[in-house]
Each structure stands twice: as structure tokens, then as C-alpha cells.
Amino acid sequence: MTEDLSQLSFEDALAQLEEIVRQLEGGQLRLQDAIASYERGAALRRYCDTKLNEADARVQAIIQRADGALETKSMD
């Protein structure tokens, strides 16, 4: 679980987060393992939130030109 989050795709991070939630909800983890899983889950949630915000910004940057064509607005 020491994998660098920046190396994960959004989908992989979300899958890991979902698995952690299942394990925590199952109630079978030892206390130390549950705490470590909770910490990892919190980091994964922040990472996924950042990725979603980045994707939203890209979508919001798409504008429609006068001729109806779509273009990507520069984020600069």
C-alpha cells in the first residue's frame, strides 16, 4: 500500500478506495490495519477528488465557436 498515488489512474485509485471501504465495512480488520486502511482511503479520496476537479476544468474549457464548432479554450 505504499504505491505512489500519482502513478495510479483515476479508475485504479477508485477501485482501491472501493475495496478499502468494503474491508472497513466488513469489520474484520485488526485495529492497526483498519487505521492504516482508513489513512490510505483518505489519501485515495483526495487523489480522486483532484483528478475529478482536473477533468471538470478540462470539460469547462471546451467552448463553442460562432460557427458551431467546438474548441478547447486555453487554460493559460
Swiss-Prot record:
Known EC number: 3.1.11.6
Keywords for this protein: Cytoplasm, Exonuclease, Hydrolase, Nuclease
EC class name: hydrolase
One of the GO biological process terms: DNA catabolic process
Top-rank taxon: Bacteria
SUPFAM superfamilies: XseB-like
Family note: Belongs to the XseB family.
NCBIfam families to which the protein is assigned, alphabetical: PRK00977.1-3, xseB
Subunit structure: Heterooligomer composed of large and small subunits.
Protein name from the UniProt record: Exodeoxyribonuclease 7 small subunit
Organism listed in the record: Gluconacetobacter diazotrophicus (strain ATCC 49037 / DSM 5601 / CCUG 37298 / CIP 103539 / LMG 7603 / PAl5)
Lineage: Bacteria, Pseudomonadati, Pseudomonadota, Alphaproteobacteria, Acetobacterales
Gene coding for it: xseB
